[in-house]
Design a protein with these regions (language model features):
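Phosphate-binding loop that captures ATP/GTP phosphates
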Residues: 1-37
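Cytosolic-facing regulatory segments adjacent to core modules
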Residues: 20-29, 39-73
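Conserved catalytic-core segment of NTP-binding enzymes
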Residues: 57-146
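Generic detector of short, locally flexible boundary/turn motifs and exposed helical patches
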Residues: 2-6, 35-39, 56-61, 92-94
Length: 147
């Protein structure tokens, strides 16, 4: 498939005046089954350099200047402004493995939210324990959100 760009390009377009963001976004988007997505940045270190303010502008432009009403994020803790990003979300879907390390990470997440008085994030977090059929569950949840 032709490389039409990635998430880094989408972030770049948000900084351009008169960039016709919606049209440029359509050129970046790829589709798997019925799910449109923007390919990730090729170097994960670049992702760590993106400031929270840049993410916020990107999300705002996607919602305001494109056909998309739902944004599904696949993010980790290395993203700047992670908790602010999660606070913008209506729902947080979190797959959790059953091993001890994963359970400890979940416990830390919950404790950090309590410490920071962000229990509201926990209230909108839906967890999936184990990997059995997680892909189908996620697809179903996304379809329900769109309807």
């Amino acid at each position: 498939q032709i490389d039409n760009g990635n998430l880094g390009d989408a972030l770049y377009y948000t900084k351009q005046e008169n960039s016709n963001f919606g049209l440029r976004l359509r050129m970046l988007v790829r589709t798997i089954d019925e799910l449109d997505y923007i390919p990730p940045m090729p170097v994960s270190l670049d992702l760590k350099e993106v400031r929270w303010e840049e993410w916020k502008v990107l999300f705002k432009q996607i919602v305001e200047d494109s056909v998309y009403e739902v944004i599904l994020l696949d993010i980790g803790e290395s993203v700047q402004g992670l908790l602010k990003m999660l606070d913008l979300c209506d729902r947080i879907y979190m797959p959790v493995l059953e091993d001890d390390v994963s359970q400890e990470k979940l416990r830390q997440y919950e404790e950090n939210l309590q410490r920071l008085q962000l229990e509201r994030l926990m209230e909108k977090t839906y967890m999936f324990i184990g990997l059995q059929d997680i892909e189908n569950k996620m697809r179903q949840l996304v379809k329900e959100e769109v309807l």
